[in-house]
Design a protein with these regions (language model features):
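Nucleo/cytoplasmic regulatory scaffolds in medium-to-very-large eukaryotic proteins
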Residues: 1-158
Length: 158
């Protein structure tokens, strides 16, 4: 018998062991859920990612340290491949956010912007891409002015 996991879920009680980018997914919405949507919106406080994207992102995190450039490139390719060929995945917005976060870490800011923008097209509301875009615009602004930027993503492994 073969079993497959479609999604990896991080609950708010697991925030201390949740990778930083998935923590952002836990805070994708603000305010209290309405009485009408309270039961269907309970997942808004969870970090949910499709299992294959999660594996590819963990590969990237593992190989993002110096000296692993080739493996890091393979992990980035794997994330792109998951998005392009993903037939059975349900959290495309999160996949684009994780890829965008990785591009931001690699200082490929145009690619990062494209990923976050794509994520917002999929899920315009309750999307962590809004936070990421704030960090991205801050980095671009600070870089253009020659200042240190906030939201440094150089330590993405903790």
């Amino acid at each position: 018998q073969t079993q497959t996991s479609y999604s990896v879920v991080y609950l708010p009680s697991e925030i201390s062991i949740t990778p930083k980018p998935l923590r952002m997914e836990m805070f994708r919405s603000t305010g209290a859920p309405s009485e009408l949507t309270k039961h269907t919106d309970s997942w808004f406080d969870w970090g949910i990612v499709d299992s294959l994207m999660c594996l590819s992102f963990f590969q990237y995190l593992n190989f993002s340290r110096p000296g692993n450039e080739k493996h890091k490139e393979v992990a980035m390719y794997n994330m792109i491949h998951v998005i392009k060929t993903g037939l059975r995945y349900f959290h495309r917005d999160t996949a684009f956010n994780l890829l965008g976060y990785s591009f931001m870490h690699e200082n490929q800011l145009t690619n990062a912007y494209s990923c976050f923008n794509q994520s917002l097209k999929i899920r315009p509301y309750h999307n962590a891409a809004k936070f990421y875009l704030g960090l991205l615009f801050n980095r671009i602004h600070a870089t253009n002015r020659g200042h240190t930027h906030y939201g440094n993503s150089s330590d993405i492994s903790s």
